[in-house]
Amino acid sequence: MNDELKLKNNLKEVRTEKKLSQTQLAETIGVSRNTISSIETGQFNPTAKLALILCIALDKKFEELFYF
């Protein structure tokens, strides 16, 4: 049995609410569009630093973007 917690997110919903493309958000925070896509689909969990950068860029609290 796998007891590892999987971090989930509302990144796509928040990003589209702010009318940003994956490319625009990626360029704003200095990562690739593929990184944004991978986070949105749950293929990649961001580091604490990247999660904080996303929160700042999108003007959201951590718990508004990420949950378990």
Residue ranges: model-predicted function:
Residues 1, 67-68:
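Short, charged recognition helix plus adjacent turn
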Residues 20-35:
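Short alpha-helical DNA-recognition segment
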Residues 1-17:
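A short, Lys/Arg-rich alpha-helix, primarily the initiator
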Residues 49-64:
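DNA major-groove recognition helix of helix-turn-helix/homeodomain DNA-binding modules
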Residues 16, 27, 56:
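Alpha-helical residues within the helix-turn-helix
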